[in-house]
Curated annotation (Swiss-Prot):
Catalytic activity entry: a 2,3-saturated acyl-[ACP] + NAD(+) = a (2E)-enoyl-[ACP] + NADH + H(+); a 2,3-saturated acyl-CoA + NAD(+) = a (2E)-enoyl-CoA + NADH + H(+)
UniProt-recorded name of the protein: Enoyl-[acyl-carrier-protein] reductase [NADH]
Site positions per UniProt: Transition state stabilizer: 157
Residues binding NAD(+), per UniProt: 20-21, 64-65, 95-96, 164, 193
UniProt gene name: inhA
UniProt KW keywords: Fatty acid biosynthesis, Fatty acid metabolism, Lipid biosynthesis, Lipid metabolism, NAD, Oxidoreductase
Length: 268
């Protein structure tokens, strides 16, 4: 992957721990030559310690996608990090809700407030991020969001599946709005990865039931995938994201690239 992203300036959102998909995207992007700006929400000191584990140093700025001031000043703050006159070549949206009702409660029991907030954070924020950053993106740039195939009702995933369906629709509109700027917008639909978010689902109020559902999901995914699946290895997903951030898919926008080793194409 060396050189694939040489000279590109990329903003990556969503690093929480070193198990985060966003962390591995950042790692692979740096190894491919990218200069990064990272964003974090809450617990910035903790996130900074995680960021310090990356191969290269990268600035970390605060971003709460529910905070209008954060969004309104984002382009200015990013420019402060990459230098006046420089622009971004890529943006990674790897933000999802941690609201209790989204995934770790029975579907019908989810509070409206959790669902509303969760869909805003997980889906609407893709449009908010694009709106904030398009003015400082170079033509030929790429916006990539993280997806999880929502075409079926996933056990224990509940309203997060609905949020991902919303994200897929938002992505199509972002692609349309970004097109005149010469910027592409796509999603990567990953198979299940053992991140902090997944651990939260397993450890939620469904308890043993959710843990068993996730275990069955993991086993079923590996069995369906023609080339197998490893929930502990996010690197193949990160490489797919970096391919979309590169110049090698200039005619691809408004769509979804699957990084699930083919599991979504198989019935059994």
């Amino acid at each position: 992957m060396a050189g694939l992203l040489d000279g590109k300036r990329i903003l990556v959102t969503g690093i929480i721990t070193d198990s985060s998909i966003a962390f591995h995207i950042a790692k692979v992007a740096q190894e491919a030559g990218a200069q990064l700006v990272l964003t974090g929400f809450d617990r910035l000191r903790l996130i900074q310690r995680i960021v310090d584990r990356l191969p290269e140093k990268a600035p970390l700025i605060e971003l709460d996608v529910q905070n209008e001031e954060h969004l309104n000043t984002l382009a200015q703050r990013v420019t402060g990090e990459i230098g006046e006159g420089n622009k971004l070549d890529g943006v990674v949206h790897s933000i999802a809700s941690s609201e209790t009702g989204m995934a770790d409660q029975p579907f019908f029991d989810a509070p409206y407030e959790d669902v509303s907030k969760g869909i805003h954070i997980s889906a609407d924020s893709d449009a908010s991020l694009a709106k904030a950053l398009l003015p400082i993106m170079n033509p030929g740039g790429s916006i990539v969001g993280m997806d999880f195939d929502p075409s079926r009702a996933m056990p224990a995933y509940n309203w997060m599946t609905v949020a991902k369906s919303a994200l897929e629709s938002v992505n199509r509109f972002v692609a349309r709005e970004a097109g005149p700027h010469g910027v592409r917008s796509n999603l990567v639909a990953a198979g299940p990865i053992r991140t902090l978010a997944m651990a939260g689902i397993v450890g939620g109020v469904l308890g043993d039931q959710a843990a068993e559902q996730i275990r069955l999901l993991e086993e079923g995914w590996d069995q369906r995938a023609p080339i197998g699946w490893n929930m502990k290895d996010p690197t193949p997903v990160a490489k797919t994201v970096c391919a979309l951030l590169s110049d090698w898919l200039p005619a691809t926008t408004g769509t979804i690239i699957y990084a699930d080793r083919g599991a979504s194409t198989q019935l059994l």
